[in-house]
Structures are given as structure tokens and as C-alpha cells.
């Protein structure tokens, strides 16, 4: 019994390794073709895939209902079930997202800059695809469509490994993507879906040097941490979305109250949801903001000063300031002006998204320049931290690192560049 149990993980790893090696080789071949594919063909594939999403809507929603029922039976959190759930409106959003990506400018071949050297050499930097992208994600079936579309339009092949909780939904959406690819005459291996939920497949993807050029994880902290710790290929990711909203003393109450409620409560399970509210000690009416949040169904946890504002505020533990709740829970701290807010953010930030509400432009400019996050906002809900809202069509994820891409990663972020050097026989002396 003990010997059998010890062997099984090794066998699973071997099987998964062979599977990912085969998928990677086919993806690499597809990437070579995609790198030179005409823009019109890539756009056609996505437009036809959108049509297929709509034509297959009943089947996709039925598959999603199976996933949701299983998730509920397994006791998944309300936030995760919300991310998993598709309804007709959300599914139409998936289809519209494909069309939006198809309409975006093709980054492949774009000239970034050029210069003529004194010796006559013409140097040009042009955008080229990354190659093969591995996307590992949980819960959100829309990622199947978004990631597939962005990879394809940027000339990359992709290998998608969705979470077990969304298996039926992912397969149904992937089938629609394949309909579009076939209609455009592009290689079907351009968008592949890992057919197993075995966790060993994730390990095989993380070790697939030479087959996968970059890994993008989309999911919870444990998934992203595992990917960052174990990957032997580059990773584009964010670990946490500890998002702050700061209400300055010069904030307009007519903006501050609805912004605070929207930033937290519009959708609590997205990474752009505010998790910590910072209120300037000199702001005139903090009670209205806190009361509006409580009345909207938010559990508010605060420091001693915040608890003095409203007796419905619960005590905040030290860990609350570093917590991504992804739920109807918010921590509130009272700070001494913009300096206090920026100091708090510097201590607890995940460098994702932070925002200020103020009518004082110099204070806003100081915050925008001084906060080291991928997205910094002024008088806007943090829930706008989304590639679609940035006009990018969709996003493959939000990167909080400092190398390559930062913030919402869409078409341009899925390319690199190469140098073209044009000469007329120049010799180096």
C-alpha cells in the first residue's frame, strides 16, 4: 500500500510532463505560423469565435451551471462562486470582448523607434510576439476567452490550464474559440486547453523551458506564490491586490461617498476592489462614508479612531492591513493627511492599485507621483483597474512587477521587440 502511494505522484508527473511536452511542441509550431499571420486572419478568428460563443450560449451556460452547482456542493466561497458564474449578460460580455480585441491595432510589426547612425546604418526596433504563453488560472471561465484572444491577436500561441472548478465552462468556451480559429484557417494548436485537472500538469508547465516562453498565473495567492516560487520560465503576475482608497481633507463629499462604496462593493471579488480605506483626520464627515459602507452590507474593521466614528466598526487586527479580502469586508484607518496615507500605503501596498479622492490638484499630483503602484488613480473608483476599462479590449492579467509589462497586460504587453539593422555594405573599422 505504501509503495503504491509513493509511486503514483511520480507516474502522474511523468504523464503530465509528456502531455505538456507534446502540447508545447505543437504550440511552438503554431507560434511560428502565427508570428507571420495577417492581421485580418487573426481578427476574423476572434469575430467568428464571438459568433460561436453566441450560437453555443445555451450549452456554455448549461456547462457553467454544472460547475457552479459542483462548487456550491464543495463549499467554495461566495467570492469564488461569483467569479465562476456566467449569466447571459456576462457571456455576452465575453463575446463582445473577443470582438473588441479583434478591433484593436495589431502590435506585431509595429515600429517602436528608428534612428540613422552617422555611418549610414538604419536601426529600427519592431514589435514581435513572445512565442508561447502558458496561462494558469482559477475560477473565471472568461479568462479562457480573454487569454486566448489576446494571445492570438498578438501572434502568440497559448496553453491554458484552468481550475478544476471551471472545467465544463472552460471546455465549452474553448470549443467556440476553435470554431473561430478553423473559420480563419489558422492552426488549431494556437489555443490549447490542458485536458487534465491533475496538479502535476501545473508543475510540468512551470518547468517547460524551451517550450513555454512566459507563464501568467491568474488566481489566488497560493497559486500565484507557487508559480513564482517554482517557475523556471519568466512569470508575469501580481501576488495580492491590497488596494487602497484615500479620502483627502479636500475631497468633495459628493464624490467621496459614492466612490468609497463603488470601489469596495461593486464587485468585491475582483482584484481592483478596495480593501483598505484611508481617511484624512481633517476630512469633515467620515461618518457618512463609514455609514454608507455599513448600510451597503460591508463589514467594516477599523483602528481606534475609525471605531470612534461609528460603533458598528469592528476592531481591526494587525493582519487586516495586509489582507486581500475579496469579500464584503473593508479595513479603515484614520491618517494624518496625504503623508500619512502614503506612509501607510508604502508599508502595506502590494503595488497593484491605489487611489486618492481630492479636489486639491497639488496634493493629487504628489500622491500620483509618490505612490509606487502599477496603477495610481485620482477621483476614480479603483474598480476601473481593468484592461477593458483601459481601452485594451481585455487583459491577460495585471502585473505589479517592474520588468517588461506593468499594470493591465494586453496586446502590447504580450510582445517583445527585435532590432532591424539595414545597411549598404558598411564595414566596422
From Swiss-Prot:
Residues forming coiled coils: none
Enzyme class: oxidoreductase
Pfam families tied to this protein: Aldedh
SUPFAM superfamilies: ALDH-like
Pathway where this protein functions: Amino-acid biosynthesis; L-proline biosynthesis; L-glutamate 5-semialdehyde from L-glutamate: step 2/2
This protein's name: Gamma-glutamyl phosphate reductase
Alphabetized InterPro entries for the sequence: Ald_DH/histidinol_DH (IPR016161), Ald_DH_C (IPR016163), Ald_DH_N (IPR016162), Aldehyde_DH_dom (IPR015590), G-glutamylP_reductase_CS (IPR020593), Glu-5-SA_DH (IPR012134), GPR_dom (IPR000965)
Gene Ontology CC, one term: cytoplasm
EC number of this enzyme: 1.2.1.41
Chain's gene name: proA
